[in-house]
Amino acid sequence: EKDTEPDKYTVFDTMSADWGGEEDGFVLYEIPEEYSRTGGYFPEKMQVYTYCVCKQYGVRYDLVVALIEKESGYKFDKVGDDGHSIGYMQIYEECHRDRMERLNVTDLTNPYQNVLVGIDYLSELIERYGTIQDALAAYNYGEQGAKQHLWKNGIYVYEYNQTIMSRMKEIEEELEQDAGD
């Protein structure tokens, strides 16, 4: 399937592989076949970039991979929410204009820029709410939505954040196993 639209993938060549990030400890993750078979694509240079940004922000790489899996199925060009949510991390541009400006991001369809905005936002939510579980709820619902629809009703654990957290643990184990090989 990847070969039918080769031009679509040139976006991964828009960034120099020399971003000065700390790659120590990086292990290539092989996305599950169910995703690659349906158009998911997470090439090594994108993974290395994501890993470096995660290290820079102090956010778990396995968490971000699990979040990308849940949000977009590794489809860097996915558009959701009636055309509002874009890319790997399904960023809602209207909600992140200030963040995009601060990060010099102009194009959420660019996977590198998309992941940078997503990790920056996730990092902020983890810092604000103190747990990955609550940060994921706020990522999914928006902060006001999480407060009104979940937390006000005593809901802290639900399908979205539990799926991501269990996948995070599985991905962590897979990466540790691959690092040991």
Task: Map each language-model feature to its residues.
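Gram-positive cell-envelope targeting signals
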Residues: 1-2
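Short acidic-hydrophobic catalytic motif
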Residues: 5-17
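Catalytic glycan-binding domains that act on GlcNAc-containing polysaccharides
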Residues: 15-181
